[in-house]
Amino acid sequence: MQNLNKTEKTFFGQPRGLLTLFQTEFWERFSYYGMRAILVYYLYALTTADNAGLGLPKAQAMAIVSIYGALVYLSTIVGGWVADRLLGASRTIFLGGILITLGHVALATPFGLSSLFVALFLIILGTGMLKPNISNMVGHLYSKDDSRRDTGFNIFVVGINMGSLIAPLIVGTVGQGVNYHLGFSLAAIGMIFALFAYWYGRLRHFPEIGREPSNPMDAKAKRNFIITLTIVLIVALIGFFLIYQASPANFINNFINVLSIIGIVVPIIYFVMMFTSKKVESDERRKLTAYIPLFLSAIVFWAIEEQSSTIIAVWGESRSNLNPTWFGFTFHIDPSWYQLLNPLFIVLLSPIFVRIWNKLGDRQPSTIVKFGLGLMLTGASYLIMTLPGLLNGTSGRASALWLVLMFAVQMAGELLVSPVGLSVSTKLAPVAFQSQMMAMWFLADSTSQAINAQITPIFKAATEVHFFAITGIIGIIVGIILLIIKKPILKLMGDVR
């Protein structure tokens, strides 16, 4: 950890290294959300269209995007482990950035499904290496008693939201309006900017932070790791081949099914590992039990929220009025632009929630109440999406304002769940499993998208109203259940609120 002189040259009163990490994450999120804004459209756009895509069925395209999201969050476990045991955070971040860049370059090439799967593999692995470690690097810029720490993280989050906000406008406009591969090229350029900002800034401002692994492997452990990794890769390749041989025509669907199972099983293994560990005390085991309903609730929340890049993206392209007339002026909307509504409402609503919590102080709702209310709002956002179909049927086009309203309500729900969930994950973590509990929070998102890979193909015009209604009601019911069982959960949580 770096000891910083508060009189040195700063970035908004913060360590200069924060500017480097701010810029790196800004451009990384720009590339990630820019690519994600057009990915599903590229997958199902006709191969004969002027702006040709891969021509996959919409159901399969949505499943691929979902499983991609699941694996991105699953890979954060690998990224954290590589930084802690092998390379150190600094080199892991840079290597991750290189892999992401190569992935976007692969997407920019017109080689069909082959380049798609190579690209997604590289981006998944690279994001897993970069995402968890760059947040840890922010923390290492400060001493434990530095009062600037929380403000520094807030500034860092602003960089994330800024990159997420402008990406759909730039990458989406070029990708959908001109050429998908050109859009992916812009995402690659964004990652090149991220790499340059990180490489240059790290050398100048924090050359020693994260340089070495915090828990390095000895020679014997490295040898065992190489042997294990080799075996895993061989088994994976054999499994890949067997899945293909079983049914070449259904290979993609079968592969998605296998990955969905992995995404669901991994968190179960993690929970069993922690519950059965001799390093976990009885009091910690009670707190871990309290985390289970929160984890399951988080899966429901993220399952709805993450459908913005699949179901909501498809609805926006096929069902919303893309040429609305407002105040006498006719506008054109690229469907990918809807993806900016998520970060936009996060930016707009965050100060309101911060002010409310500051005003309430110790009187603010408990974690369980916030979770429950957040889930109810998230479920309500999908009930809103039933109204266009109920009022005017599902064959025509509806106002884009339905999506604006849906995102506004859903992001209010996210601000009640996401920051609280991240915080409570650390508070309820057993001492011996602090980092693993942070991974568990990411795994909730991973599991939700693994489930989405199975349920999003159900969505079509004929099922639109029922899908939104059932999914929304599930979210509301889970929120209500949390409020009902609040007392026993709080009892298990002990002094954590």
Swiss-Prot record:
Membrane topology, from the record: Multi-pass membrane protein
Q: Which residues lie on this side of the membrane: Cytoplasmic?
A: 1-36, 84-92, 135-154, 201-224, 274-293, 355-372, 445-497
Sorted alphabetically, the keyword list is: Cell membrane, Membrane, Peptide transport, Protein transport, Transmembrane, Transmembrane helix, Transport
Q: Read off the SUPFAM superfamilies from this record.
A: MFS general substrate transporter
The record lists the membrane-crossing segments as: 37-55, 65-83, 93-111, 116-134, 155-173, 182-200, 225-243, 255-273, 294-312, 336-354, 373-391, 426-444
Question: Pfam families from the entry?
Answer: PTR2
The biological processes this protein is annotated with in GO are: oligopeptide transport; protein transport
Q: What GO molecular function annotation could you give as one example from this UniProt entry? A: peptide transmembrane transporter activity
Q: Where in the cell is it found?
A: Cell membrane
Side of membrane Extracellular, spans: 56-64, 112-115, 174-181, 244-254, 313-335, 392-425
Q: Which CDD domains match?
A: MFS_DtpA_like
A cellular component term, taken from the record's GO annotations: plasma membrane
Matches recorded under PROSITE patterns: MFS, PTR2_1, PTR2_2
- InterPro entries the record matches: Dipep/tripep_permease, MFS_dom, MFS_trans_sf, MFS_Transporters, POT_fam, PTR2_symporter_CS
Q: Please, which domain of life does this record's source organism belong to?
A: Bacteria
* UniProt record similarity statement: Belongs to the major facilitator superfamily. Proton-dependent oligopeptide transporter (POT/PTR) (TC 2.A.17) family.
* Function in brief: Proton-dependent uptake of di- or tri-peptides.
Q: What is this protein called?
A: Di-/tripeptide transporter
Q: What organism does the record attribute this protein to?
A: Lactococcus lactis subsp. cremoris (strain MG1363)
Tell me the classification of the organism that encodes this protein: Bacteria, Bacillati, Bacillota, Bacilli, Lactobacillales
Gene symbol here is dtpT
